Curated annotation (Swiss-Prot):
InterPro entries xref list: Agmatine_deiminase, Peptidyl-Arg-deiminase_porph
Organism this protein belongs to: Streptococcus mutans serotype c (strain ATCC 700610 / UA159)
Alphabetized GO MF terms: agmatine deiminase activity; protein-arginine deiminase activity
NCBIfam families: agmatine_aguA, PRK13551.1
Homology family: Belongs to the agmatine deiminase family.
Gene: aguA
A GO biological-process term: putrescine biosynthetic process
Catalytic activity: agmatine + H2O = N-carbamoylputrescine + NH4(+)
Superkingdom assignment: Bacteria
Residues annotated as the enzyme's active site: 361 (amidino-cysteine intermediate)
Name by which UniProt lists this protein: Putative agmatine deiminase
């Protein structure tokens, strides 16, 4: 049985969160099923999730966690793919965002593996959370750790989602003020308190605070739509010259800020420009999404956060969102230039964006040890 580690922190024990670009053992995912979040009984979303899983499975194993009532359905759909690199695990969940409710894995210099189980409150709890209850999602990290036999730290009274952090594995973490300082997360903590928590549980020494994200309403501005480390000393950041684009102000501010920063090692950051979609992505057929009391309803024509930067780095590859947009090919070209030694695989993910996230949001990497 995996243990809960008490009275100490990852920093004290010599564990750190590795960069996403470091070697991985597998990718974890959850299965979408909520009729009040996904269109058409979640069937289009399930198809998109499977296409993401199939793309990942070309490079490394995928563990796909599925609630009991969807187990046979998911098993049949995966069998149709013919992939032997995707395993199905029965696990109850509230929704499918394992980046945010799953464990953040840690490693040490001896090759040992541990994890952080952050407090999860569905992106805002009773202030502006997206659904209630969220008790099953709050158990996902612990369940994954039990399956893998990984000891974990529980952050008592500290709420954090995995999509709100990006690390370089060498002491630097990217976050946004919009999310981490939002009153629905940790209103009892100061900015300095939050920095201390990040340093203790990620074993980082420098926190780079980007001001705003591009998703103020659902995630309250997660960093993984805006900027990420692609290797130590280098970040990708969304960018557009189109002043009429809805992401223009936030993208420009983030790019300008990061271009002036150094990392924990004192290196000036090299900032790569990542394009945004030519046209914003808007939700269609919202009437096929059920209304359920306790969940935030989706409305026809609301803007989905379609960010190319919400890609996933895997062993030897990049799994990149595509939207049928004019800039899809440009995004692939830019990412290939950032990662010349990795194969870039594009997957159409509008259906995931309609539900509130994208490829990075629905995946969680487990490092190799």
């Amino acid at each position: 049985m995996a243990k809960r580690i008490k009275n100490t922190t990852p920093k004290q024990d010599g564990f750190r969160m590795p960069g996403e670009f470091e070697k991985q053992k597998q990718i974890w995912m959850l299965w979408p099923w909520r009729n009040d979040n996904w269109r058409l009984g979640a069937k289009p979303a399930q198809k998109a999730f499977l296409e993401v899983a199939e793309a990942i499975s070309e490079f490394e194993p995928v563990s796909l966690c599925v609630p009991p009532l969807q187990y046979e359905n998911a098993l049949a759909r995966v069998s149709e793919l013919g992939s032997h690199n995707i395993r199905i695990i029965e696990m109850t969940n509230d929704d499918a965002w394992i980046r945010d409710c799953g464990p953040t894995f840690l490693v040490n210099d001896k090759g040992d593996l541990r994890a952080v189980d952050w407090e999860f409150n569905a992106w805002g709890g009773l202030v502006d959370g997206l659904y209630f209850p969220w008790d099953q999602d709050a158990l996902v990290a612990r369940k994954v750790c039990e399956i893998e036999g990984v000891d974990s730290y529980k952050t008592k009274d500290f709420v954090l989602e995995g999509g709100s952090i990006h690390v370089d594995g060498e002491g630097t973490v990217l976050v946004t003020e919009m999310c981490l300082l939002h009153p629905s997360r940790n209103p009892h903590l100061t900015k300095e308190d939050i920095e201390d928590k990040l340093k203790d549980y990620l074993n980082c020494v420098k926190v780079l605070w980007v001001k705003d994200g591009i998703d103020p309403y659902e995630t309250n501005g997660h960093i993984d739509d805006v900027a990420c480390f692609i290797r130590p000393g280098e970040v990708a950041c969304i960018y557009t010259d189109d002043k009429e684009h809805p992401f223009y102000q936030e993208a420009k501010a983030a790019y300008d800020f990061l271009s002036q920063q150094t990392d924990a090692k004192g290196r000036p950051l090299k900032v790569h420009k990542m394009c945004v979609t030519k046209e914003p992505c808007y939700l269609q057929e919202a009437a096929t999404i059920d209304y359920v009391e306790g969940s935030i309803p989706r409305e026809e024509g609301e803007m989905a956060i379609a960010s190319y930067l919400n890609f996933l780095i895997v062993n030897g590859g990049i799994i990149l969102p595509q939207y049928g947009d004019e800039n899809d090919q440009l995004a692939k070209q830019q990412v290939q230039e950032m990662f010349p030694d990795r194969k870039v695989v594009g997957v159409r993910t509008e259906e995931i964006a309609y539900g509130g996230g994208n490829i990075h949001c629905i995946t969680q990497q487990q490092p190799a040890t």
